Every structure is written in structure tokens, then in C-alpha cells.
Amino acid sequence: MTRQSPSRADASRPPRADASRPVPPRFVRPGAGVVKVGTWHVGTPARQRAAVEAIARAWRRRARPGGGPLSYHVHTSNDGTRLLHYSQWTGEDAYRDFVRTARDGRNAEIDAAVPGIERQGLRSYELYRSRRTDGDGREPGCVVVVEIDFDGPDPERRRAWVDAVFAAIGSDPQAHPGGISAHFHLATDGPRVLNYAEWESERAHREALEAPGDGVGSATEQWERVRNHRGLTGSRVTRWTPALSLGAGVLDRRV
């Protein structure tokens, strides 16, 4: 069950003034039962750009599959080597129908344009909690994906950790102003939490990491509870730039 923050994270997002740029995901979306997140390794910035263009062509020239996705967002890694895919579906059955009837043709066209793509690590998630300040109209220049692993799949432990993060954010006396939003997802197929965090820029996120304390967040008791939460085994941080968004009945939007 998705928990919305008191700010109703997506209801406050104003219409975009610049339709040439990708639309951020609508995280709290009616009917979205599962989120798929995966990466492709492409190797170079030039191949990143070519792959994004190939994805846009492959999807634009075909009818949208009846079962979805509800939305599909592609990001380029800031190190120039990978793509991140974030898609929303009504459920696993809708995704399986897409794989059975529509995925291979699209992938074949993309692979013909950019040979040698390595498709890695597609996982299923459910959105648990989102946070965005009411009326904050800033657009993300950088998406920070934080993957947090636990020593077991217990969903209650993972929810408790996310709740602790929200308490720490809400009480932080020196939160970096460059953070825009945070959207926490629980893996349905393993012991992981994924935070899709929107920031003004990569520089803003780096400044937050370099501030006093251990990572993003001040040296408070609440953040200490987050960092020492029972069952944590490790985490990984990657930075991405929004590149392409596709949705039902919506023209693609590209950088």
C-alpha cells in the first residue's frame, strides 16, 4: 500500500512550461501496481544518446500496448555509460503481457541501432512513501538513485527504516536546499529499498554529501538511527539525468 506524504507529493507539481524536456514520473499514480527499474550498459556518452533516440523511435512508431506501461522514463548516467529505466504498470500480469507480445520487436529495433547493449538488473518495486513540498515547482537537473540492501526481505523492517528517514528529514536543522523530492520504493522480489530522489543539480547533491556528517543529512540523533538501523547491509548511490519520458496518450518528451 502506497503511503503519500502530507505534502501530496505529485498533486503540488505545477504544469511544465517547457514541453521539450522530459516529464518527471507521476509517482502517486492511480492504477499503478508495480514499478519496474532496470539498467542498460551502453559504454559511452555517444552510445547513450544513440540508444535514447532509438528507444524514442521504437516506441513512437508502434501503437502503445493495451496493458501498458502507464509511464516509461529513461535516464542517462552521469558517468556516460548506462541508461536507467523507470516504468509504471498496473501489475505483473500487464508487464508479462508486454514481454509476450510487444517487447521483442522494440528491443530488436533498438539493438540494430546500438548493437551490444547489456541489459542488467530489472527489478520490481512498489512505491511506499513520497515527499515533496507543496508548491515546489523546481525541475530536477539530477536524479539520485539510492539502493539500500537489508539482510532479509522483511517488509516491516524496510518500512520502519523509510519511516525513520522521513523523521530525520523532517527534523534536520540544516537540510540542503538543493533536494527537491524523495520517493521510496520497496522491492517485491528481494530485500531492497530504492530511493528515487530529485535534486536541482549534481553539484547540489555533491555539496550535501560533503557537508559535515556522514552522507546526506546532519549529525542528528534521528539520522544516526537511520544509519545504524537493524538489518542494513549496504547501499549504493548513482546519479542520472532525465532523458526521455513516454506515457499513455502523451507524446514523447526529450532533452
What is the role of each PLM region?
Residues 1-83, 90-255:
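Short S/T/G/P-rich N-terminal loop/turn motif that feeds into the first structured element of a domain
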